[in-house]
C-alpha cells in the first residue's frame, strides 16, 4: 500500500485550481481563501461552528454543588465514570485531529478540523470546571484517571486508541479512512449513553448545570459528526477505490463494534439502577443511532427494526436542544446561548 505523503506547509508549486482540489493526495497551497472553496458545505459548517462559541464558566453550577452529594449511589458512580470517559475522549481528540489534518489537502476542511480541535479543548475545560466545582481535588484526580483504572473504561478506550495509534505507524489511505470512521463512531455513538444520563438527571430535577454543559458539548459534537460524515462521503466520490466490498465490510464491523461497546458500557454504568433509564432503553436507542450513522453514509441499516427513534427515548432530543429558552433564578443567562446570529450571506 502506497504511503501517504504529509503535505508541505510552504508549497509555491501548489495548484490553486479549486476543481483539482482533493480531500487527500492533492497538491495544496495551504492558502485559506474563503471565496474559493470546492466543498460548498464547508461554508455552512464553518459559520455554524463559529456561532456555537460558548464559555463553560458562564454556566451556573451552584445547584449542582448541592445536588451532587445527594445523588443516589448508582447515579454518583455513573456521573463520575461517564465524566472520566468523556474527558479522555475529548483529550485524545484534541491530540489526534492535527494528525489527520496533516494529510488533508483541502485547506477549507483543515479550517474545520482546527475549529473542532479548539472545541475539544473547550469541552475538556468544561469537564474540569464541573469537577473542580462539585468535588475535592482528591476526588477529582480519582475521577479523571478512572479511564485507565476501570477495566471497562480502559477496554472501551483501547478500541479507539489502537485505531488512532495504527495511523501513527502506517500512513496509508485505508488506515486514514479507518481513523476517520473511528472519529465518526466516537462523535456519533460513543458519547450518547453519557449524554443521555445527564439529560435524565436534569429530567429528574438533578444536576441541571451539568446537563446544560453537556447540551453545549452535544451541540458541538453534532457539528463534528457532520464534518466527518461529509469528509467520508467526499472520499466516496473522489476515491471510490478505497471503498471496496472488503473495506466497506471492515468499516461496517467497526460501526457494529462501536454500537455494541456503547451498549455494553451503558449496561455497566447505568444498567437498571438509575431512575428513568434502563438497559432496554439504552440498547434500543444506541442501535437506532447506529442505524442512523451508518445509513447516513449511504449503506443499509445495521439493525432491522431500529430505524426510528424509540418512543421511550423521544425526550432526549428535547433535553439535548441547547437553544431551548429556559431561564430561572439560578441561571446566569438564557440557555439560548449564542454569541452571534447566523449571517445570511455566504463566506
Where are these regions (language model features)?
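Non-heme di-metal
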Residues: 2-347
